[in-house]
Amino acid sequence: METVESMRSEGFDIGLRKTIPEAAYLPVAEQTVTREGIPVLANRFAAEAVMQGAHLYSPGVKNCQGLRSGMKATVQDQNGVLVGSGIARQGETAILNYHQGIAVEILSSRFRLPPLRESRWYESGLIHLQSLPSMVACHVLDPMPEDVIVDLNCSPAGKMSYLCQLSDNRARVVGFDRNTRKTEKAREHLERLHCKNYQLIAHDSRYAHLDYTLRADKVLVDPSCTGLGVTPRLSVDTTMADVENLAAYQKQFMRAATALVKKGGTIVYSVCTITGEECEGVVRFAESELGLIETDARPIVGSGCLDSKALSQRFDPELDGAGYFIARFIKP
């Protein structure tokens, strides 16, 4: 609460969620971006970040012909949608050759949000930017002191750090990611938030149950998905083959989680998407093929499921601002 009051005292209109006491939010205003200066083409991911107020970093730039440091610039995506404007902090040669640092300092964006990642509250580990559904998924897992918790898909460690926080840093939290660079980034994040009693393992967690003797009280499965619930989006290029392949991929993590968790232990499956093949399809697989028992995914914060009798929880992008799915299982 002290952090919230500090931010409010400096003009931030901070609100608090009643259902999740650690969740604070800022109202978002949409505005029109006008074209001025040199056009800068950004990839979709960078453009979506700029659209929400982030600065444009050099790795996200695809083209910036004629740009010099100090020039006005307008950032657009590959379809010509204007997402933000500001001042170039590097020239074309430096941006495209070195791929480091801020390319365009954004002064106006489509959605007006302050650059919180550059604030002193963020740098000192007092705040972290995370979606409400992601926080709910951690509450559904219900981490307790002395638990052994495995996060099979930990990068970038947003949920992992929150699990540490919810257990007062007393649970042993083990995070897996197959990419060593990502685990190092996760470590930086966990250190910034002053997390303790955690372990990061660079390993393909689909095979964690075969390669490690670790046994967990609780397992979080938050695998790669089609991401169709992420908002705002500038474009969607997902195919049915993508949906089917990712659903099959997710089932591999559920199989590993089932082997890792102790009898009577908890598995939470969460994805930031809305397809039935991934969400409910993975639930059916977990019950019929893995023998898991689905239980209520509480606390209920999302607007509801496709089936009113379902035990899982859905967030609707139209009603809740983002699409998300959470299911909770017990291993008998």
Describe the residue ranges of each PLM region.
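S-adenosylmethionine
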Residues: 1-332
